[in-house]
Amino acid sequence: MNPEHSPLGKATVYASQYDASLLFPIPRAGAREQIGITSALPFFGTDIWNAYELSWLNARGKPQVAVATFYVPAESPNIVESKSFKLYLGSFAQSKFDSVDAVRDVLKRDVSAACGASVSVQLVSPHDFGKLEMDELDGLSLDRLDLDADVYEPDPSLLSAAEDEAPVEETLVSDLLKSNCPVTGQPDWGSVQIHYVGPQIDHAGLLRYIISFRNHTGFHEQCVERIFLDILHRCKPVKLAVYARYTRRGGLDINPFRTNYNQPMPDNARTARQ
């Protein structure tokens, strides 16, 4: 489905009852073709969605609330457009469910169907809200660099690495990632973590490259995949992982993770800006 046909940027009618048809899938293939991915994926990973505005009624009509986390595999053929996800979750508000498990099962079934792959779902109930963590992405901050920047569309030529020197292992972070919704033009603010093993990447060039997304239009997942591929092609690391955490909109935050080597799932602790 085309993003222009999604609920984004259109007048909204909020459903009063649960409605799975509100979910609007968008194929990943189109955006991947634009960055040269036409066959096997050069990465694997997950999109971590956190939903903070989920509520439903129990069997006796009493409202219940939870924080939901969805783990969408990067190999799924579709993503779900975020406003449609918000409207879908909102449709639970006046619908009765017998248990938390019943809600989880419905969420897993519907979102998996929309994405075209098995999606894991976790629900955190209010008595466990205090266990939810807040933390910043770990790594050496690129934002410490005092530099000039004047490129605000993605430019891979800003990236370079010392290929004639000994390889290094580094984790680098920046809070200066900003892109824009391809439908509404609204800004998407994010933090990004880049872990790699290979020729040392020029830090100033990498920061300028991250800044260059400032006027770019693309969904969160697409931006992270572009960053991953550009670093992979320009800097030639042996191992590479890119993880971004975007600020919340409509009660949802989206946190794409891409890697080309086996490692544990990244921490889902929300950052201060989320």
From Swiss-Prot:
InterPro entries, A to Z: GTP-CH-I_C/QueF, NADPH_dep_7-cyano-7-deazaG_red, QueF, QueF_N, QueF_type2
Any GO molecular function: preQ1 synthase activity
Record EC number: 1.7.1.13
Top-level enzyme category: oxidoreductase
Annotated active site: 181 (thioimide intermediate), 188 (proton donor)
Positions with a binding annotation for NADPH: 82-83, 249-250
Sorted UniProt keywords: Cytoplasm, NADP, Oxidoreductase, Queuosine biosynthesis
Alphabetical GO biological process terms: queuosine biosynthetic process; tRNA modification
A Pfam family per the record: QueF
Compartmental location: Cytoplasm
Reactions the enzyme catalyzes: 7-aminomethyl-7-carbaguanine + 2 NADP(+) = 7-cyano-7-deazaguanine + 2 NADPH + 3 H(+)
Gene Ontology CC: cytoplasm
Binding annotation for substrate: 80-82, 220-221
Pathway: tRNA modification; tRNA-queuosine biosynthesis
HAMAP family linked to this entry: QueF_type2 (MF_00817)
NCBIfam families noted in UniProt: QueF (TIGR03138)
Family per similarity comment: Belongs to the GTP cyclohydrolase I family. QueF type 2 subfamily.
Subunit structure, as described in the record: Homodimer.
PANTHER family to which the protein is assigned, alphabetical: NADPH-DEPENDENT 7-CYANO-7-DEAZAGUANINE REDUCTASE (PTHR34354:SF1)
Entry function: Catalyzes the NADPH-dependent reduction of 7-cyano-7-deazaguanine (preQ0) to 7-aminomethyl-7-deazaguanine (preQ1).
Entry protein name: NADPH-dependent 7-cyano-7-deazaguanine reductase
Organism: Burkholderia multivorans (strain ATCC 17616 / 249)
Lineage of origin: Bacteria, Pseudomonadati, Pseudomonadota, Betaproteobacteria, Burkholderiales
